[in-house]
């Protein structure tokens, strides 16, 4: 019986490694091909000129102004989208959990609704709105922050909702209220520190999604990283592929940080609190 279990365990281990190897080749081979393409000069020899230019910001800005404009615009869009999403979503989800539990399903439906709406449909609906946005706020690409908050909403909501589900929000709030804390104190000093990893997860997901968005920015005639890469591909395929590879690596890095922070938060929540032995009375 023990030998049968051992053989089954070995077969499962081999199967897992085969699956992991196949998936690794499937995902990493195109990345290696992109890297090889960006390091191949016109004479066929290996060169790092493309990557040296990519990290030399003044020279890159002078050589490829559309790309530099898109990078700056995307950084601003990432920052403002994350801030706007957290300011709108975190208090709303916490308040619904604490005071309006009957509206939880409705809020969940509204937050997940963008998953069913294609980006092109969003553009059709947002185009008249952005005509007024341009009239009042100008044609800055940072105004895409309002549009990007919609597609990132489902992912941010799921991350924050999972964090709230892992703690006893009601007990924490009732304990804080019994000690005289206001609702604002309960929200920002009691609940929020306990879902810090969930908030970071939501922020990382938003960064990855905003950096990869193309359709909305292109159809609304705004600039971002993906629009800059698309324009760059018409004049310099090597630099376009290099920037795409750098963006993919950045997104993978953010997802890796997401898994690390998420795993650390789960382990911290599962670790039992240390028990302090009571002193014996004399």
Task: List the predicted regions and their residue ranges.
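Short hydrophobic faces within alpha-helices
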Residues: 71, 96, 113, 160, ...
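Membrane-cytosol interface at the C-terminal ends of specific transmembrane alpha-helices
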Residues: 138-177, 185-186, 190-191
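Membrane-interfacial helix termini and adjacent extracytoplasmic/periplasmic loops
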Residues: 6, 48, 120-150, 184, ...
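Loop-to-helix entry region at the N-terminal start of transmembrane alpha-helices
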Residues: 16-17, 66-73, 129-156, 196-198
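Interhelical loop and adjacent transmembrane-helix boundary motif
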Residues: 8-12, 45-62, 211-269, 278-282
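Transmembrane-helix boundary motif in ABC transporter permease subunits
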Residues: 2-8, 78-111, 124, 128-132, ...
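N-terminal signal-anchor/first transmembrane alpha helix
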Residues: 1-33
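Transmembrane alpha-helices
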Residues: 17-27, 150, 157-160, 183-212, ...
């Amino acid at each position: 019986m023990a030998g049968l279990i051992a053989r089954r365990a070995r077969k499962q281990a081999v199967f897992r490694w085969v699956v992991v190897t196949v998936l690794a080749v499937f995902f990493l081979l195109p990345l290696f091909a992109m890297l090889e393409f960006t390091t191949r000069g016109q004479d066929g020899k290996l060169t790092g000129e493309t990557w040296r230019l990519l990290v030399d910001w003044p020279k890159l800005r002078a050589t490829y102004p559309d790309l530099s404009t898109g990078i700056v615009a995307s950084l601003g869009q990432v920052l403002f989208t994350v801030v706007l999403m957290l300011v709108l979503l975190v208090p709303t989800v916490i308040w619904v959990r604490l005071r309006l539990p009957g509206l939880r399903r409705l809020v969940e439906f509204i937050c997940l609704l963008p998953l069913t709406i294609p980006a092109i449909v969003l553009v059709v609906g947002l185009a008249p709105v952005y005509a007024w946005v341009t009239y009042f706020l100008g044609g800055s690409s940072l105004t895409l922050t309002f549009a990007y908050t919609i597609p990132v909403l489902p992912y941010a909501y799921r991350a924050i909702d999972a964090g709230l589900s892992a703690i006893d929000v009601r007990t924490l709030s009732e304990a804080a209220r019994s000690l005289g804390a206001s609702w604002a104190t309960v929200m920002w000093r009691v609940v929020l520190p306990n879902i810090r990893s969930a908030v970071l997860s939501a922020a990382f997901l938003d960064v990855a999604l905003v950096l990869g968005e193309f359709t909305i920015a292109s159809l609304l005639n705004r600039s971002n990283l993906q629009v800059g890469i698309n324009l760059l591909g018409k004049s310099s395929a090597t630099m376009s592929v290099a920037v795409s590879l750098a963006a993919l690596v950045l997104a993978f890095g953010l997802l890796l940080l997401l898994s690390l922070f998420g795993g650390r938060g789960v382990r911290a929540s599962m670790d039992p609190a240390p028990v302090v032995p009571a002193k014996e009375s004399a």
